[in-house]
């Protein structure tokens, strides 16, 4: 668990997550290692992708289709699936505007998915 930065948005408190938070969460998962491709961070479990930085705000997270559909329904402001990922087991998380708990859950689910392949 991490302590998010709290900001005021539209008169309400909202938590922010950044790539440092993602790094702390992902690297705390057994077997997950950080690497960089073309200057962008990625986290892998035994070589299998858990999550990858798209830019400073967006993170692509591995997710099976059922979990992805559930997260899209429950957290439409946090997760999306661009056209290029529709056929892939991936979901994009909005770190700056998304639900931090849901993103944390998605990272852990991605790790569990990759561990299940062992």
Locate the predicted segments by residue.
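Charge-dense, helix-prone N-terminal extensions
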Residues: 1-118
């Amino acid at each position: 668990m991490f302590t998010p930065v709290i900001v005021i948005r539209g008169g309400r408190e909202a938590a922010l997550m950044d790539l440092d938070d993602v790094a702390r969460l992902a690297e705390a998962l057994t077997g997950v290692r950080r690497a960089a491709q073309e200057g962008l961070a990625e986290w892998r479990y035994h070589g299998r992708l858990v999550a990858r930085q798209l830019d400073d705000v967006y993170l692509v997270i591995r997710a099976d289709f059922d979990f992805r559909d559930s997260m899209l329904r429950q957290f439409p402001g946090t997760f999306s699936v661009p056209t290029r990922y529709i056929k892939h087991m991936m979901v994009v998380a909005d770190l700056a505007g998304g639900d931090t708990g849901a993103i944390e859950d998605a990272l852990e689910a991605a790790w569990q998915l990759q561990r299940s392949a062992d």
